[in-house]
Amino acid sequence: CIQLGTEQTCKSVDSNDCLVTTSVKVCLIGTVSKFQPSDTLLFLGPLEQGGLIFKQWCTTTCQFGDPGDIMSTPVGMKCPELSGSFRKKCAFATTPVCQFDGNTISGYKRMIATKDSFQSFNVTEPHISASSLEWIDPDSSLRDHINVIVGRDLSFQDLSETPCQVDLTTTSIDGAWGSGVGFNLICSVSLTECSTFLTSIKACDSAMCYGSTTANLLRGQNTVHIVGKGGHSGSKFMCCHDTKCSSTGLIAAAPHLDRVTGYNQADSDKIFDDG
């Protein structure tokens, strides 16, 4: 979303796509990611435990020992070719047997033995459906390059001036202070003097700020959630906008009382922080 003076517009921009208005053009270019369209993602347990990225997962001409060599498919079991040769082995007064000269280690066993050499990824808040898998990447390994082109006829003097008035109240807080767990600060934000306002709401104490989120405010009351990390046992976290903060702040819990994975992580982890 962009807001220039009274002009405001939003668009979901994909790779190599642009948001174009009369005054500005914003393009998403050169998206860098650890994932490629042809990659295969392998989960060895629950989705929350993450998975491995395979660049060369066999699908058609599989040899025994390749990743994905023996797989169940909608048309039956996929059986790989054997990379080797058979020869007859005979001994006196016994039935001849066939001896295989080649690889006898399956792709799964070979993968398990060398899984640390594959690139891995973490998964947070997964959502799976019949046709898609969505999750949040806690590693922040995705890098998007944004190119902004501004028209020459744009009046920069008026961009910082807005009639919008914002009042803030700190409603509640979840999580803990410190850098291990993180907290979720819930703010009640009142907007007057204009119908919509795109701006940033921050979570701060008297010393500094620990997190922010972009909010598209509407006239009246708005509820804004801010995720942050930091602070200490005496920090009173307040909701702030620009240089204005709520009149009161709230104290978060101690880190050893909350899970180390954070308030918004998987609840199945029972690891606790000692503070």
Swiss-Prot record:
Glycosylation sites: 122
Superkingdom assignment: Viruses
Pfam families, per the entry: Hanta_Gc_C (PF20682), Hanta_Gc_N (PF01561)
Protein known as: Envelope glycoprotein
Key words of the record: Disulfide bond, Fusion of virus membrane with host endosomal membrane, Fusion of virus membrane with host membrane, Glycoprotein, Host endoplasmic reticulum, Host Golgi apparatus, Host membrane, Host-virus interaction, Membrane, Phosphoprotein, Repeat, Viral attachment to host cell, Viral penetration into host cytoplasm, Virion, Virus entry into host cell
Keyword Disulfide bond in record: yes
One record GO biological process: fusion of virus membrane with host endosome membrane
Keyword Disulfide bond: yes
Lineage of producing organism: Viruses, Riboviria, Orthornavirae, Negarnaviricota, Polyploviricotina
Family, as annotated: Belongs to the hantavirus envelope glycoprotein family.
InterPro entries: Gc_C_bunya (IPR048791), Hanta_Gc_N (IPR002532)
GO cellular component, one term: host cell surface
Intrachain S-S bonds: 1-10, 18-27, 58-62, 164-194, 187-239, 204-209, 240-245
